């Protein structure tokens, strides 16, 4: 049974936590004692219905404010597949949490309040979904009950969002629209009795039917070395293994490999996983690889196939960045750049453009990027990094920028 990773997104109070609670409730994924606790908590708030958002708004601050701050991971399953949902914050102050929560998902559920329509934070979340290359985006027009389930309202919002989607850089991604009511369970797991005019799938049907190809297994092979194993025991006196997680592609015993950045070459002798010898391993597998010759390999080196084009050694390059700090990004600033497990200093050479997420237009010649703004930059690193263009190999094309004094993550970037 496969696992589908999903992330919710949307502005504050668009109903993300309620939607997830509804999915859990209607798929019988909530225990009896939790339902009883939910009933008690809902009555305490003076409600005559189950406040399903309380299932995921776990932090005390979230319950008091009625918003999601941290990224909560929720698990449920159907007879078809298992699901992991990242309930990400909608408030603009917590956009960084949304970027983190959506970084490795296959489906993004972007909620829109039917009363509000398109707002800036919705446009920002669409831009982030496009930037992260999330394969499927479902735009859920929620709270249809508050607009009397009017088809005209849904179509009006859909039209404005369709225009925005057309202007956004979605490449090979599927974008669809659903009218729903999380509060009353309309079009979540069963057809909406109050919206007979909508003939499409329910949300759960969309999720169940979604199929995706694991593209990373077919990308260029990359194996970042996380740890060098040298037991130095009687039984394993000469053993030298390289442990890590294959980030993309496939490696087989007998493959000729090249080490980056040194350029040394060798051949794979064995691949082991949990002390079991394998003939091959693919993206996502955590393994230990041994080579036929003793060469100098350290933590942070990357193994690639000698027959493939090696990841370029980048020192001066361009990137798209989402800025996550209150202190603006300006040319000349220096940060720590972390790519995989490697960290080096990086200096911002230039901000080439800033994206207007609503108009989907770029402004050139800007001198800063402020909190939650998206733009393109040029930067120079102290040491080269073995990185691919993000669009071709997402697992090896992303990085973060870190403030070297506060150690806070201030930006997330994508190599272009």
Regions found by a protein language model. Name each.
Residues 13, 19, 38, 66, ...:
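Residue-level signature of catalytic and energy-coupling elements of molecular machines
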Residues 155, 163-299, 304-327:
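Conserved catalytic-core segments of large NTP-driven translation/proteostasis enzymes
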